[in-house]
Amino acid sequence: MKKFDKSIAAFEEAQDLMPGGVNSPVRAFKSVGMNPLFMERGKGSKVYDIDGNEYIDYVLSWGPLIHGHANDRVVEALKSVAERGTSFGAPTEIENKLAKLVIERVPSIEIVRMVNSGTEATMSALRLARGYTGRNKILKFIGCYHGHGDSLLIKAGSGVATLGLPDSPGVPEGVAKNTITVAYNDLESVKYAFEQFGDDIACVIVEPVAGNMGVVPPQPGFLEGLREVTEQNGALLIFDEVMTGFRVAYNCGQGYYGVTPDLTCLGKVIGGGLPVGAYGGKAEIMRQIAPSGPIYQAGTLSGNPLAMAAGYETLVQLTPESYVEFERKAEMLEAGLRKAAEKHGIPHHINRAGSMIGIFFTDEPVINYDAAKSSNLEFFAAYYREMVEQGVFLPPSQFEGLFLSTAHSDADIEATIAAAEIAMSKLK
């Protein structure tokens, strides 16, 4: 049995210092029935907690670390920038370099604005969509999480789903009434919503792959249908690619599925592990943002040199060939997990999109939030705790997916499959 004495003591102290002892709810490990692991360091595909335990890491800081921990080029870039100054309140050339890469690789983006988080990106994109169209309502999908902005914290997934809170206290009714929610992958419900409210819907916001109800890919024709219905009704289509951006494909989720939105929100990977976000799209729309237009958005640390340098060094290391290798590794892990579950007769459903993998402990195909909620959460919690004992660090929520990095080796994946085999043999 692993010992967690130092993590337990650190969490006891933290609970007197921060709400729930953490700075983001899912880190409290509540849904898996254990104390959170306090991490000390990471290198490549491995992380090490303060008790000295080693883990193969599939959290990767919730997705950003696509090259694993402490990537040499990213670390050197950060050292170089820090020695010259961390922020100036004035433009720097590294902002141009990262912006050029983003514009070059993301089909929908002609102009991009850097911000400090994915939440900030989605909030800003909604304001832009409303300002550009002159409409008030937005349409989102049940179980899709787009950050903690009031307009979007309606029937959200991820941490909200994990805690069993469909909405959050503090979101005014006046805000909530302008958010229309329908089931993910249900195009007919989208069409019906436009029949009812079409003249007042500014935008549809969607994750190309729903990543905060587990990993739930779009059904064939779903994204194409959203593109068609928004164009027909004069609404904007926003892809929230904070999670899928540069994760599922070289050209992001929109390149992977061949559907181009009007606006795209980015985060995670483009910061290389530092706080960052971005939103971009058609020049005609983006030029409405101040100072070139009347729609205001600003940020003290937006485009700061540290985040821009980490993001740039992260993206330049990603090539089309990187994603061929991601596909091979992800297929290997998916097949191994499926084989282990089948061997022990454990009800399961596995979804995957590129290097994102979700395993649900249910017999039901998972195509939306209701299906995801059919998972056996008690079994997941027991499986999670056993995987920790076996030295594998997974996201501590049934409603989050696993992430792979360029640092994960075949040996890591084989060890993970072996750990899952042991865990499932004990729990069947």
Swiss-Prot record:
Q: In which pathway does this enzyme or protein participate?
A: Porphyrin-containing compound metabolism; protoporphyrin-IX biosynthesis; 5-aminolevulinate from L-glutamyl-tRNA(Glu): step 2/2
Q: Which cofactor does it need?
A: pyridoxal 5'-phosphate
**Principal cellular location given in the protein's record:** cytoplasm
Isomerase in keyword set: yes
Q: Quote one Gene Ontology molecular function term.
A: glutamate-1-semialdehyde 2,1-aminomutase activity
Q: EC number(s) of the enzyme?
A: 5.4.3.8
Q: Where in the cell is it found?
A: Cytoplasm
One of its GO biological process terms is: protoporphyrinogen IX biosynthetic process
Entry protein name:
Glutamate-1-semialdehyde 2,1-aminomutase 1
What species is this protein from? Bacillus cereus (strain G9842)
Gene name tied to this protein: hemL1
